[in-house]
Amino acid sequence: MSAADIATKRIYEPAAAPDGHRVLIMRLWPRGIRKERVDTWLKELGPIPTLLRDFLDERVTWAQYVPRYLAGLERPEAQAAIAEVRRRAREGRVTLLCGCADEQRCHRSLLRAYLLDSPRARPRSPRARAPRGPARRRRA
């Protein structure tokens, strides 16, 4: 999976062909958005309601929000949703959608980075093999 396979976009921006498979990653359905504008809704990838409320009410800073959101991605239901996004990304481009206006301080950018930086996203490298041929003994 490469950076080109996963994009992010605000749900209120018009859909476009390059978006590929559009995945909404909010716990609540956004107002005014028709279901036809989204291919898949994975609410398990949205921040838990208490974390989002604390962040919006400024009881939690962005620096505190980030590790708490990422920790939430380790929940089994979130991991199942992440597996779905990875599967879709192997088939073609995926666009992660959210209602946040500021992409830099939004969970969609955190999720994209998580998907791209996670060991499961990296191509598997060939295993190191032992040298072939007769074994060499070390001299004492």
Give each language-model segment a name.
Residues 1-140:
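Residues lining hydrophobic/aromatic ligand-binding pockets adjacent to catalytic sites
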